[in-house]
Amino acid sequence: MIRSRARAVCTSWCPALALAVLAGCGEFKWDRPPKPPPEAAPPQRAAVATDALVAGSIAAQTYLADVEPLALRGFGLVVGLGDKGSSDCPSVVREYLAEYLTKQIAPQGGGRRPKLSPEELIDSLDTAVVEVVGYVPAGAPAGMRIDLQLSAIVGSSTQTLEGGLLLPTELRLFDRAATGRGMIQGNVLARAGGPVFVSPFAAADPRKGYVLGGGRINEARPLRLILVQPNYQLAQQMERRINERFGPKPRVAEAVSRGFLTLKTPPAYAAEPDHFRRLVVRLYLDNQPGFVERKVQELTRAATAGEVRLEPVAYAWEALGRNVLPRLQPLYAASDAGVRFYAARAGARLNDSAALAVLAEIAAARGDPHRLLAVRELGASNSPQATLPLVPLLSDADQEIRIAAYLALQEHNHPAIRSLPFRCVLDRAQLNCVLDLVECDGPPLVYVRRTRAPRIAVFGRQVPVHAPVFYRHPDESVTLVSAAETADVKLFARWGRKLSDEILVPPRVSELVSALADVPEPDAAGRLRGLGLPYSRVVQVLAQLCEDGTIPARLVVEQTSLTDILGPEDTPERPETDRDPPPGADAAPQPPEEPARDEPLLPARPKQDAARGTR
């Protein structure tokens, strides 16, 4: 059958390719010339600022360069498309892929050879050549994962990328002006691969998709700190101050010339390179106790008088270090909500447990304008006590607060969330999706991620699937049926011309998702474990069942924004919308614009039953 042929192709190619690519990681460097690059002409600006916030800081005499996201591009092969792929491929890309795939397999030697040669694989209708684009944020550390955008080659006859698997792919600097072999030349800066997510909603282009967290950066991407007035002694002074604050090993700052320093994100900030970028420029060159005392007083007066924006002040407090805590702690009780939050934020980042208690109060206070930020700040803390106040917020009346608390707790692997991973049918080493069961009170909620990792979170206690159930996908690839309220839900799939065995599951959302997403293999009793549907198809089924009331829950899809690529602004927001298209919905290969914050569009609707009336 079609699915069987796709599985055979992947079985023969994927494991060997994965081993070869892993063995080759770390052999490549970022594109950089052998000598320091020419120093950019400084912009027309004052060399030294005089206001209380900036005067004496690194920001007063420098500016950061290389802060835009860096676009990477590569060409790869998606397998597992049945007969919906194509053999269309530009000759230059075809030659490159054939050579690359051959080299990756050759070192294995002595093992099982693939059933198809690279050329035959490219020509198969089970595969499609795609352009792969990813964005590396400023200051990204080595090993950081990035989302990928995939597009079928323009002009090809590929019908869809849904259900496919991107074979290991090389990513290089994206030169939009490059043509011919120039498109595939340059150092390999990242590796890519994984299951493809195609938006299941009607407006999406099935020839475009995402691989969530599918790119891995080979080496850290440094920043450059440019001196407005080049001076090597000053550059060295800044180097010493930065390394003193963030630790000399591994080396964070290096004065390359009189005109600039290079900065690498320290390990403590690996998950938040934007945090480091905003903090480092707020360092003051003078670190003597007398200066610190005077500076704290200046900053506090300016903040409480409303003379400055509070976000930069909070970074300045944090940059001064733990010596500021005695002056900062009285502000935890400030009458001004903004001063209170930002003082507590700075204190929490300086490991003050009293500040965490204040953030917990803000997070729990309905109506506080900094509530969502407090939840995220608690989630970013490494302190074990920071997660405790987040658990009750899973049941909060505010949907955004519930989701933010879940995201924070999930990052900490908190026991309040039980995670069930499901492997990819085409390659068991890859992840199809993760089901997070969030045991909490409050209205049932289904939350779907569209960045970083394919995750579905189900909020509630034993969220039911109401009968009668009848769902059939438009292409008849999956069918769900249940007649009685207490009856099990019957599922089966169509693989080519063959029907799968039936699966019976209790009428609960957790059981239903497991049956849809798990691999189609027998369990210990010989029964089929799952249908092996791709993440996008699982989301599509859930969306329809939530919309018609079969599942009494809202379906909320994470909405990506410019923040996901560039990092948060001074007051970050991650809007969430109901039934907003997941990744790949007509997304151009470039950073999206910051979306407006939307109200929920899809509340849980009562299911209509002609015989019994409204549920």
Question: At which residue positions do the language-model features occur?
Answer:
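Ordered, small/hydrophobic-rich secondary-structure cores
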Residues: R224-E244, P248, A337, A344-G347, ...
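Active-site proximal loops enriched in glycine and acidic residues that flank catalytic Cys/His/Asp
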Residues: T265, Y332, R345, A363, ...
